[in-house]
Swiss-Prot record:
The keyword Cytoplasm applies. Residues 1-36, 257-329, 428-496, 707-806 are annotated as: Disordered. It is found in: Cytoplasm. Residues 521-806 are annotated as: Interaction with CRISP2. Its main location: cytoplasm. The lineage of its organism: Eukaryota, Metazoa, Chordata, Craniata, Vertebrata. GO terms for cellular component: mitochondrial large ribosomal subunit; mitochondrion. Residues 13-27, 320-329, 773-788 have a biased composition (Polar residues). This is Sperm head and tail associated protein. Coiled coil: none annotated. Keywords: Cytoplasm. Residues 277-290, 710-723, 733-754 have a biased composition (Low complexity). It comes from Mus musculus.
């Protein structure tokens, strides 16, 4: 059995009070000393042998060596003083049970391949979140954990510390995480001949197995807890012990070394750099994995500011921009290993500090063929930390880490998308979030689609970001004949706004629809009812797409209706255009008018392709949601219903104009005065208009002068004229006139009766004064159809009832 490069996992707990972390209710083996009560630091070291030749060499690799001669760190004793800076997990509690069978004992005879520091983050043994079991928890120091599923609601505050300095601790996120930490070399320690890289683990003998116990050898240190099985008859082997066969392939991580040790030269030899060009598919090994070796070693593991060429041939959007810190920060490299195999190569990563992310595989992928691992790696739909209850791959991030960007979504959607349907606004207002599509490796060919090949990279770096691939929904229903089923259209759309969400779901696929600015002169003759389906649920074909298409059902039963894709506009503002009758009101029950079908104004797409015998529905003309008169829509202002006379609008009514018919043709007792009224034609407005106030506009101005009354009245009602003359007779009653003029606008009949009642109570002195005022030149400003006769008649009418009553 060939042994693969070892992998170190250190779980150290800070030494606190003896009784705080380690109560006495935990049962230790009889031969184990009471090191827990003395405040020990448990350490777990693991060696993961994997089958050689099936490595994900294109994956991120860990810091192989902190010295220039990193390839001899496991064979050359002088370099064993340096710590193995690959992974550190600091936790006050250790996993007690690991749901994997006991593997065969490791063989450390064959040396690992040089210049490699492998790491297996996709192990069900290491890469699962710890979840506390409901029963059997013995103590905070040694709790029972199951390594399956999502973290428990009792989140633990772990600490990520260096291997050599446990006092320098940094708080992790609330949930348990795997922290990728590198550490400076321990130069002061003397070299020891041991395969273990850390000097503290030199004399520790470990057994292979998944159960925690504390059998310490006589020569070992007394402040460490060792993972060992219940089978104590197994031969003890010094050094790294646990060796489960995990999917028969190794996954490497590439560390971002701290600035203090960046002067040692290249730390990741024979590994692929960030700016290395994508390898051709001919150079891929026959194992079928999507990661390949790069013959040219990079000069450093530090991330470049931008990846000029994407890592694969899938080509979906802007390239990867790995920023190793905040903007303006002098720290170019970061501590920790960055995993980007789960991301699309054009995603933007911003990790201000170290522990970055962890990817976990489903448990059944341990013995599955080589196709299951890339599928879990490539899953881009990351909604939150715990959106995955089934135990599939997920992503853990630390505070400050932002991942944004599109996803490689070109195939059929996956059913594992997050349960809510998130909707991110876009300039087009019709982008629908789609689930991840057909995860593939970086160098795997794209699945055959109807989309044309993507644009090549232009010269400028800004235009190098290829536009996102957009696929519109099928515009034909499911029962369309084969001759009309070719209605797919692939378009390129502008990029969404470059906003950095906390966890920007990268599975956003905009659906482009065609817009038109031409108004339909008349609705289709065969259109019976047009309905707009509200996007309440997602169709089965696209579980993450919240938009349902709008259908235009036709009256003919044999013709399938066209489907409008991705409807997000549901505001119908098109006026009726199928009749040439004057503008009517909803209160008019006597004139039956045909109610035409109203086309909702929005973004739609007409059926594509030349129709053979089907008359297609003309799309609406407005692309504005809340605009009654769109700017790009020509309209006739004479058709606006704001003039008090009837007009016949032409056949083409501009889209986006509401017809407000507010005039009642029947005289009402208390009609409502609305300034904008559409009256009936002059043939119908007979003497009934004298009592209808809706066709009368009275403008009384009492602020300029007491005796100046501007009266515009075209009716012949004597009551109104007399009331107006009565209002203008006394200059001492200015406030009363103003109040009555206000009330007259609401109910003119009531104010006229009040004036008549008041005029009967007036004396002879007021009549004389009103007669004099009626003969004054101020009365010439009273505008009516007959001035002189009307004044004389009104004065006589005022005089006669008062004289009789007197």
């Amino acid at each position: 059995m060939n042994s693969s490069p070892p992998f170190l996992l250190k779980i150290s707990a800070p030494s606190t009070s003896p009784q705080a972390d380690c109560p006495n209710n935990y049962s230790f083996p009889p031969e184990s000393p009471s090191s827990c009560r003395k405040g020990f630091t448990p350490v777990l070291t693991l060696e993961v042998p994997v089958a050689p030749g099936k490595d994900f060499n294109d994956h991120l690799s860990c810091n192989a060596g902190l010295s220039p001669n990193a390839g001899n760190r496991f064979t050359n004793p002088p370099y064993s003083r340096e710590p193995f800076s690959c992974l550190t997990i600091s936790s006050p509690c250790l996993p007690r049970r690991i749901p994997t069978p006991p593997p065969p004992p490791p063989v450390l005879s064959s040396p690992p391949p040089p210049e490699r520091c492998p790491f297996e983050p996709f192990s069900p043994l290491l890469g699962r979140l710890y979840r506390q079991e409901p029963a059997g928890s013995s103590s905070p120091c040694f709790d029972r954990f199951s390594l399956q599923g999502s973290p428990s609601p009792h989140q633990r505050n772990l600490c990520c510390n260096y291997i050599d300095s446990p006092e320098s601790q940094r708080s992790c996120p609330p949930s348990p995480r795997l922290c990728y930490v590198t550490s400076p070399p321990l130069i002061h320690q003397a070299p020891r001949a041991s395969p273990v890289t850390s000097p503290e683990l030199t004399h520790i003998t470990l057994e292979t197995g998944p159960v925690i116990s504390t059998p310490l050898m006589p020569g070992s240190q007394g402040n460490y807890s060792i993972i060992s099985p219940l089978l104590t008859h197994r031969p003890l082997r010094p050094g790294l012990a646990i060796s489960p066969p995990l999917a028969h392939r190794s996954v490497e991580t590439r560390p971002l070394t701290p600035a203090s040790i960046s002067h040692r030269g290249p730390h990741c030899p024979s590994r692929r750099s960030y700016n290395d060009p994508p390898l051709s598919s001919a150079s891929s090994p026959p194992s079928g994995n999507p990661y390949h070796d790069n013959p040219m070693p990079p000069n450093s593991c530090e991330p470049k500011p931008q990846l000029d060429v994407p890592l694969g041939k899938n080509g979906c959007g802007p390239p990867l921009s790995s920023q190793a810190g905040m903007s303006g920060s002098p720290i170019s490299p970061q501590e920790g290993c960055i995993h980007y195999s789960h991301l699309c190569p054009d995603s933007q990563i911003s990790a201000p500090r170290s522990p970055f992310c962890v990817i976990n595989l489903p448990p059944e992928s341990a013995g599955s063929p080589s196709s299951s691992l890339p599928q879990a790696l490539q899953k881009p739909c990351v909604g939150s930390f715990l959106w995955e209850p089934g135990g599939n791959s997920y992503l853990l991030l630390t505070p400050g880490t932002i991942i944004s960007g599109p996803s490689c979504t070109t195939g059929p959607p996956l059913p594992q998308c997050p349960n809510p349907s998130p909707y991110f606004p876009s300039p087009l207002n019709n982008q629908c979030v789609a689930p991840p599509q057909s995860p593939r490796g970086y160098n795997e060919p794209r699945p055959p689609t109807s989309a044309p090949p993507q644009m090549k990279s232009p010269k400028s770096p800004e235009s190098r970001r290829n536009p996102y691939k957009c696929r519109s929904l099928d515009n034909t229903p499911h029962h369309t004949p084969p001759s009309h089923s070719k209605s797919h259209k692939t378009n390129t759309c502008p990029q969404p706004p470059s906003q950095s969400f906390g966890l920007f779901s990268p599975c956003m696929e905009p659906a482009i629809t065609t817009t038109s600015n031409s108004c339909p002169k008349e609705p289709p003759p065969e259109t019976a009812v047009l309905k707009t389906v509200a996007p309440t649920s997602c169709p089965h074909s696209s579980p993450c797409n919240p938009a349902l298409p709008s259908r235009y059902p036709k009256s003919s039963p044999h013709v399938p209706p066209p489907v409008s894709p991705c409807n997000t506009h549901m505001y119908s503002v098109v006026p009726p255009t199928s009749h040439l009758s004057p503008l009517s009101s909803p209160l008019n029950q006597s004139i039956p008018l045909p109610q035409p079908a109203v086309l909702p104004c929005g973004t739609y797409s007409a059926p594509r392709g030349p129709p053979s015998h089907i008359k297609s529905v003309a799309p609406p003309c407005s692309t504005h949601i809340y605009s009654f008169i769109p700017l790009r829509t020509p309209f006739d202002p004479r058709c606006l219903p704001v003039v008090p006379r009837a007009r016949f609008c032409p056949t083409t009514v501009p889209c986006g104009i509401h017809t407000y018919a507010v005039t009642s043709p029947v005289p009402l007792n208390n009609p409502s005065q609305i300034p904008y009224s559409c009256s009936l034609p002059p043939s119908k407005t007979s003497s009934t208009c004298s009592t209808s106030v809706s066709s009368t506009i009275v403008c009384s101005d009492y602020q300029s002068s007491d005796s100046q009354i501007n009266h515009q009245n075209k009716s012949q009602s004597p009551n109104k004229n007399s009331s107006l003359h009565n209002q203008s007779k006394s200059p001492l009653r200015r406030g009363a006139f103003q109040s009555r003029s206000r009330s007259r606008s609401s109910s003119p009949l009531q104010s006229s009766t009040q004036d008549r009642n008041e005029s009967t109570n007036m004396g002879v002195k007021h009549h004389k004064r009103s007669r004099k005022q009626s003969q004054s030149p101020a009365d010439g400003k009273i505008e009516s159809q007959s001035k002189s006769l009307q004044h004389r008649k009104s004065v006589g009418q005022i005089k006669s009832p008062h004289s009789k009553k007197k």
